[in-house]
Regions:
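Compositionally biased intrinsically disordered regions enriched in Thr/Gly
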Residues: 2-6, 10-22, 27-283
């Protein structure tokens, strides 16, 4: 008589577990293949989340950059700052000189700021502002054929004071120049702040910042190259220049809502109004 073996019970829990593992593997492989062939797509789109609103806001901030300069202070920290002022009845940043003249030989619309903090480093910077902008006003008044506009904006975010000075200069028949100067100062530590320190404060890696800047500059130059081929006279950027590396960037500031602005004002050293603005939006 042939022995009868007992029937094994089917382990449905184990089958379900294997099935789930199989499905997860298939999804993982599918996602990897998708990212391989569509790596330029945003991950948010894959999950039904788009960044179109952020992109619209980003472009709006860039397009409205020149309208920021209203000759005043935007202090997001309220009155919780303790600084030793030069003049107690003035704000931390105020207008030191104002020139609004329209003469036959020149036109001036100039507001020159002063940082109202009593320490040696700030005094040195205030003197630089005086030497740069007031001296230019004096030169223009003794000359002819000039249009000179100077405006500023100051922000205080995270104990960092950021002063930005925007100037436009039209000399006779030459092209207009647009120039930007910035000054960033840690009010709590009484020292100037580097761009790298600001990026660290915002948890932005320097390598990521470099990549973003390079990509945006490259995209702008590619568009300019296309327009140049059509016969337009476009400003040429050297996309491989080290001026686009974080350690070498001179003009930057923390603006409204904690957004970090990086500015390449080519008029600072060329006869041009061309300027690039790269913004790291605060999340």
């Amino acid at each position: 008589m042939r022995p009868v073996l007992p029937q094994k019970k089917i382990n449905y829990k184990l089958l379900i577990l294997y099935g789930l593992i199989f499905v997860i593997c298939i999804l993982g492989i599918g996602m990897s293949m998708y990212m391989q062939y569509f790596q330029d797509e945003k991950i948010g789109v894959i999950f039904g989340i788009t960044d179109s609103e952020d992109e619209d806001l980003y472009n709006e901030l860039k397009n409205n950059f020149s309208s920021l300069f209203t000759n005043d202070l935007d202090n997001s920290q309220g009155k919780d700052l303790e600084v030793k002022k030069i003049k107690e009845d003035f704000d931390i940043v105020a207008t030191r000189h104002t020139y609004k003249e329209e003469q036959e030989n020149y036109t001036l619309d100039v507001s020159i700021p002063i940082i109202n903090i009593n320490n040696e480093e700030i005094k040195t910077y205030n003197q630089e502002i005086e030497d740069t902008y007031k001296q230019k006003v004096d030169e223009i008044k003794a000359s002819s054929g000039y249009i000179y506009n100077v405006r500023y904006k100051c922000y205080i975010q995270d104990n960092i004071l950021s002063l930005v000075i925007y100037s436009e200069l039209k000399e006779k028949t030459s092209n207009q120049k647009i120039m930007i100067e910035t000054f960033n100062y840690n009010l709590a530590e009484n020292k100037e702040v580097t761009l790298e320190e600001i990026l660290n404060l915002k948890n932005i890696k320097v390598s990521d910042a470099n990549s973003k800047i390079k990509n945006e500059i490259k995209e702008i130059q590619e568009k300019n190259d296309s327009l140049t081929e059509l016969g337009y006279n476009m400003y040429k950027r050297d996309v491989d220049s080290d001026i686009y590396e974080v350690p070498n960037i001179e003009q930057y500031f923390i603006g409204k809502d904690g957004n970090v602005y990086v500015i390449f004002a080519y008029g600072n050293y060329d006869q041009t109004s061309e300027m690039d603005v790269v913004i790291f939006m605060n999340k």
